[in-house]
Every structure is written in structure tokens, then in C-alpha cells.
């Protein structure tokens, strides 16, 4: 069977277009690259809830519960699991940590008791092993 002379050229052109298209898609989301993520995503929200819980259990030495005033940034990175990066501004509430229901605690508005803190968290989740942990955090008073 004899192929027309332009057939190899067409195949080569098609291959080059396919490779260029896939390289373009890869440049937008690199494996291991950090990119902004959606706070409404269930797994992102679970990682953020974990960071907030650990903040109040381990990092926040105050007797009052703190909750987020604002999540300023959220990123994720696919590694051997998922790394989540959060920048969160916390506010002190009127509820002490010993109270049973802390979800609806109002923020403390009294000047002497009002306190805010900015924290950056790196959370690692390995879903298939059911593991989640804080790899790194840094907090400062605002």
C-alpha cells in the first residue's frame, strides 16, 4: 500500500499540536505546584476545621475560645497526600474553652478583652491513610 507523500507530514503536525496542547495544560497546574483553592470544597473545609480546632487546643493558650474573623488565603499542593496552606485572622470570643457549645460564640468587643491574631498554617492530609496533621504554623498578635 502506498501512502501519499503528505501523510507523514500531517501525522507529524497532529502530534506536535497534541504535545503543545498538553504542555500548555500542564503549565497551568504543575504536579506538586501550589495553587489557590476553593474554601467551599469539602476536603478544604475539613482541613481548615482541623487547623481551627488545633489552634484552640494547642496554640491558643488563652482561656477564651477564638474563631476566624477572616480566612485571608487558602492554597493546596498535591504531594504524597495534600498540603493545605491557610492564612487566618482569629478573634477572641466571649466563650471560655470549657463551655459546651462554642460554634456560635460572639466576638468579644470589650476593648480590654478584644484580641486578634494572624496565623499561617500548613496542614498535611493523607486521605487513604486517614491522617491529618499540622506540619507548620506561625502566629502573631495584630
From Swiss-Prot:
It is found in: Secreted. The record marks 32 as: Reactive site. One of its GO terms (cellular component) is extracellular exosome. Its main location: secreted. InterPro entries: Cystatin_dom, Cystatin_sf, Prot_inh_cystat_CS. Residues 1-20 form the signal peptide. Keywords: Disulfide bond, Protease inhibitor, Secreted, Signal, Thiol protease inhibitor. Disulfide bonds join 95-105, 119-139. A motif (Secondary area of contact) lies at residues 70-74. Thermostable. Cysteine proteinase inhibitor that possibly plays a protective role against proteinases present in the oral cavity. The order of preference for inhibition is cathepsin S > cathepsin H > cathepsin L > cathepsin B. Monomer. This is Cystatin-D.
